[in-house]
Structures are given as C-alpha cells and as structure tokens.
Amino acid sequence: MTDRYAVFGNPISHSKSPLIHGIFANETQQVLDYEAILAPKDGFESCLKLFWSQNGKGANVTAPFKEQAFNLCDELSEEAKLAGAVNTLTLLTNGKVRGDNTDGLGLVADLIRNISSLEGKRVLLLGAGGAARGSVLPLLKAGLKVYIHNRTQEKAEKLVEIFTPFGDVKALSIAELIAPFDIIINSTSSSLSGDVPAIPSCVIGVESLCYDMMYSKEMTSFNSWALELGAVKAIDGLGMLVGQAAKSFELWRGVTPEVDTTIKLLREKIKSE
C-alpha cells in the first residue's frame, strides 16, 4: 500500500500543500499519496487516528489545529516545544507520534536564499502571535539578533522571556523604534486586509530587507509600503511556505527536495488563478 500523507485544517480547500508535495515527490522519485483533509473543528483527534490506521505516515497541520496537534504528540522537537505548536506530525516505527514545527526553519531557509549571510544581522520581528513564536528560535540559531515589537507589549515580553536562554532577543516599544534594521519581518496578518503595521517608517532603511509572511497574487501591502520607503528588497512568504514543506518532506522521506523550481511553479499558478 502506498504511504499516505496529508494536511489537516479547517478550512483547507485553499491549501497549496498537496501541489507542493506532489512536485517534491516527482522531483525526488518518491512514491506517495498526499491529500488535503478537512477535519471538523471538534473532531481533529478522531480524524487523525483514522488517518494513522489507514497507512498514514505523516501529516502537516494548519489552522486551527496546531496547538491541539502539539498536545497529541509523544515526542517533540526543540522548535515545537518552544513554539507551543506543531505543523508536522510523523508516525514513528514504534507507533509513537513525533511533532515538529518547521515554519521558522522554512523562514530562515528562505532568508538564506535571499541574503548571503544572516550572522549578526538585526531583525525586527513584527507581531507576537503563533507565527512569530514559531520563528524566534530558528532566527536565533541562524545568528540573528531578534527585536520583537507587538501592539501589546506584554506579548512581546513573554516571547523574550521564553527565548532569552537561546540568544540575543529583546522586546521594543514603539518609542524605541528609532533607527533602521537589517531585516524587518511582518508576522502579522495586516496584509490580508491591505493594511500595514502601525510602526514608524524610520525602521526601514535603504539597506533593509523586508519580509512579509503573507503572500498573494499581487505584491502584499506591507512589501509595497516597504519598497516605497526605499527598502533594498521585499519578499513575500511563498518561499517560507515551500521551505517549511521541504523540511517536513525531509523529515518524512529522508531526502531534501530542491525548492527554487517549486517556488517558481507555485508563483506562476497563483498568478494564473
């Protein structure tokens, strides 16, 4: 029987994961099935159990189930433990379930694709929700100095408390945003509504790279704003999406897919939709 993989979410029809993993499987000559599964909001656990019983080998998890998936794991990676959420599940040969969080790893991989060196650079991370929390440890491990700004200062300070043992991380109030950063990452959902975070424009300089975790057919509102302010480059989150999927695929199959072609194909598909 063919090994089965899936992405669980609600809603899930928008997911690009089946397309991405299909491309990865073809590229690496892996024989597998990958599907999108709409789990009832109150029935994720039973849905997952059924999947494991029917030759499920691994699963991706998206909203609103990442925290619930975390609680269903027998083992957790360091990234998952600190993120408090899981986006990748693997059924181990002993029957136990391992949880990983590859979101931040995908972000760092995409940053490395676009910048020659991350070591020592100062990054302003906007937002302190799940997307931000899943990114802090990989950013610190990459040698970045992380500064977190959130509308609610206490949330930013909570992340600092969690991640201080792992590197140089600080919370900044809006009054402390007074100079440009090397990298500005928008982990908020502001671009979904065509808005930009309420931050002073001085944080973006002529050598700043700006990164929006959102992606769309057109340039995101955050990236348009950043380029208008003179940012040297603005990148959306499509590469992060493909990057986190590549890390999941590697965990499951033991092979590392090449991401550049997949990003290009996905970009073309999104523009044609």
Swiss-Prot record:
Enzyme Commission number(s): 1.1.1.25
Entry's Gene Ontology cellular component terms: cytosol
Entry's Gene Ontology molecular function annotations: NADP binding; shikimate 3-dehydrogenase (NADP+) activity
Sections of the chain in a coiled coil: none
InterPro entries membership: Aminoacid_DH-like_N_sf, NAD(P)-bd_dom_sf, SDH_C, Shikimate_DH, Shikimate_DH-bd_N, Shikimate_DH_fam, Shikm_DH/Glu-tRNA_Rdtase
UniProt keywords, alphabetically: Amino-acid biosynthesis, Aromatic amino acid biosynthesis, NADP, Oxidoreductase
Signal peptide: none
Active site positions: 66
Residues annotated to bind NADP(+): 78, 127-131, 150-155, 213, 237
Binding site for shikimate: 15-17, 62, 87, 103, 215
Record pathway: Metabolic intermediate biosynthesis; chorismate biosynthesis; chorismate from D-erythrose 4-phosphate and phosphoenolpyruvate: step 4/7
Pfam families tied to this protein: SDH_C, Shikimate_DH, Shikimate_dh_N
Residue ranges crossing the lipid bilayer per the database entry: none
Record's catalysed reaction(s): shikimate + NADP(+) = 3-dehydroshikimate + NADPH + H(+)
GO biological process, one term: aromatic amino acid family biosynthetic process
Sequence similarity: Belongs to the shikimate dehydrogenase family.
Subunit structure comment from the entry: Homodimer.
Free-text function comment from the UniProt entry: Involved in the biosynthesis of the chorismate, which leads to the biosynthesis of aromatic amino acids. Catalyzes the reversible NADPH linked reduction of 3-dehydroshikimate (DHSA) to yield shikimate (SA).
Protein name: Shikimate dehydrogenase (NADP(+))
Organism: Shewanella woodyi (strain ATCC 51908 / MS32)
Lineage of the species this protein comes from: Bacteria, Pseudomonadati, Pseudomonadota, Gammaproteobacteria, Alteromonadales
GN (gene name): aroE
